[in-house]
Amino acid sequence: MSKFVFVTGGVVSSIGKGIVAASLGRLLKSRGYSVSILKLDPYLNVDPGTMSPFQHGEVFVTEDGAETDLDLGHYERFTDTAMTRLNSVTTGSIYQAVINKERRGNYNGGTVQVIPHITGEIRERIHRVAANSNADIIITEIGGTVGDIESLPFLEAIREFKNDVNRNDVAYIHVTLLPYIKTSGEIKTKPTQHSVKELRSIGIQPDLLVCRSDKSINEALKKKLSGFCGVNINSVIEALDADSIYSVPLSLKKEGLCKETLKYLDLEDKKCDLKNWEQLIHNLRNPGDPIKVALVGKYIELGDAYLSVVEALRHACIEQRALLDLHWVSAEMIENNSAETYLNEVDAIVVPGGFGNRGVNGKISAIKFARENKIPFLGLCLGMQCAVIEWARNVANLPDASSSELDPNTPNPVIHLLPEQEDVVDLGGTMRLGVYPCRLTKNTTGKNLYDEDVIYERHRHRYEFNNYYKQSFLDSGYKISGTSPDGRLVELIELENHPYFLACQYHPEFLSRPGKPHPLFKGLIKASQDKLTQSN
């Protein structure tokens, strides 16, 4: 039977609950426990699939095709465990499910209310993850901040949850902020005291406090927090600002987070094996020469919009003992100036996914610059589509080529809508989503990188390479190095006589892990290193 850990946050938003939950998952897994982590998000959207990246950051796609919060990416990367659509719950999806049940008559004419129906549905979702994953420990992160109106149904649900299980089957962790007042030279505990008071008023007594701070917390402060918040002093956990999110599990291990959590769950504190993780941090802190990577996108004002891409680059650099020197380049700025202005000094170029017209011509110019100047290049999803358009216009003698998404009237739609998408009306959850197989072509860079005949990658798209133009592309020097098993969909393309030029229709960034970088990102960094070595 599963045990349950609930992670709440107080004082401020973006306090780091997701990293704490993911780090605890890593620590538990290092002790031999199986873990699944879910996120309860308090917004009314059914999922983040149609939300602006500027507001929400990236949409993380699970194996089974769910469009989820970016925190699920942290969960997967830290625990190396695949999550499913069950691991992402929003207020919108809860209300949708309850209203659908009411319309079907499931409540037998009863009055449908927040308590018990909404809170009951939330509890059922948590139990469903436990039943589906069969994990030893289920960690649940509650989005938002204690005191927010939006989070109240979730907090009430996790309060009720302790009545569903034995008391030693559940633990509550509260992540909070201890601000340092520079003028007085003091760390203040009052905001945390009030946050815990608010949590208690709901009926939840936290078992552990994880205290975010940029200054070390002494024993006197821990004792004060213990007394005012009703938490054992050993369960007051210091969480200092870290040089990398990947070093957080090690610092929380040192503070005893996992040990104390297991104590509340009445589980054995097994021997912890973090040798590989410690080696990862050693490599991260002792890199070799820098690699200047330009990420050419349209949402660069918010780095979280490309979170998994950045982490995948970081994983590859750690593996290759390189220092990631990331250059954020606005595709629109390239449109207004020139690619050379922004890309002349970089060692590699990445064009990630996206939607819509804005910035597309800048991306195409960046790809042309990478191709002509032999700069290692990797295109992802829309990045592949832009690479196809660039080749069609500048090499394959189709100067008016485009995508039917960008120009519905283009005479040469080298990228077109997938046939199964033609009658789709709704935007949310209707794309080609989740894991699909890709058969690799022999004697290609792609095949050599993966060293597999068939790979499985995550997708999120409506548009695809138009096979009507396949032969003209092949005749002009393009190589198709990966397709769907039936050969209908082009998944991976590359160029010969180039240090590294690959583009894929899928999203490899979602499968990259610290210590296990994705082959396409590792290949990009290695090619950049090789090119630098040759030039020196």
Curated annotation (Swiss-Prot):
Binding site for ATP: 14-19, 71
Listed PROSITE patterns: GATASE_TYPE_1
Disulfide bonds: none
Residue span of region Amidoligase domain: 1-267
Positions of UTP binding: 13, 188-193, 224
Gene Ontology CC annotations of this record: cytosol
Record-annotated active site: 381, 507, 509
EC number, as in UniProt: 6.3.4.2
Binding positions for Mg(2+) per the UniProt entry: 71, 141
Pathway(s) it belongs to: Pyrimidine metabolism; CTP biosynthesis via de novo pathway; CTP from UDP: step 2/2
Remaining remarks: CTPSs have evolved a hybrid strategy for distinguishing between UTP and CTP. The overlapping regions of the product feedback inhibitory and substrate sites recognize a common feature in both compounds, the triphosphate moiety. To differentiate isosteric substrate and product pyrimidine rings, an additional pocket far from the expected kinase/ligase catalytic site, specifically recognizes the cytosine and ribose portions of the product inhibitor.
Name of the protein in question: CTP synthase
Organism: Prochlorococcus marinus (strain AS9601)
Annotated gene: pyrG
